[in-house]
């Protein structure tokens, strides 16, 4: 939580342009080729977004974020009524495994009183859906990809697993045992592996700032130079760009990928949202859960386990068998 969909989603992943030096270049894989896309910097305090009351930034949580996001969409549709009634899909990645289901749930509930959201589906990429399952999948992922030793894998799954470490860390009660285990894991995985794509050169990563939120131990004393991210930061801090975007900085000196003023209730990580996904399916909302298979932060193995269990509990059947998926010749 606390990182920008403008900086990451729009400029590093699926937006219409990417920064290249002093200019923008077209992204041939832009989602804008298929739909009108809004990239929302949320909650207030992220990126260019701000609150008139700085006290807002203290203790922001999932519930507040869902309500604020829904109010934003309500007011956006009021301002641009030509978009009312159009099919609406909401998408996100990582901690948006909380943001998106919770927002969709609020929209479904609101529609019972006043149907203004034509919500058709949601898409969740490598999402945090259930804290222990998702976070503890990291150990097996590291081990299976040769990033940690057998001995480290054993202590990372028995002495102190990742969900326990994160709980202690954000709860301000980090035990010496978990500190030792994470030091060992960090030493072996190193800061030269992009945790969001373990096969990439770290310089090509676009999302390492987020990993400092979901991998808190690794933020101490480390600053990895990430090329795409750095170009985005430089571009969005240009005065002429800010003027063109009608954006201004309030309460911060510069635009950053992840907020330095927001104090999010990070233990909201422990709130499961997989059941919310199930309720959305029951209400007729289409749900896509997809995973990049080289992401070690929220590995596909955890997501697959959660989705399979949900499908079993709901009595859902497989309609399309598992298959090789080609895009062009790849």
Where are these regions (language model features)?
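Terminal and linker regions of secretory-pathway proteins
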Residues: 1-330
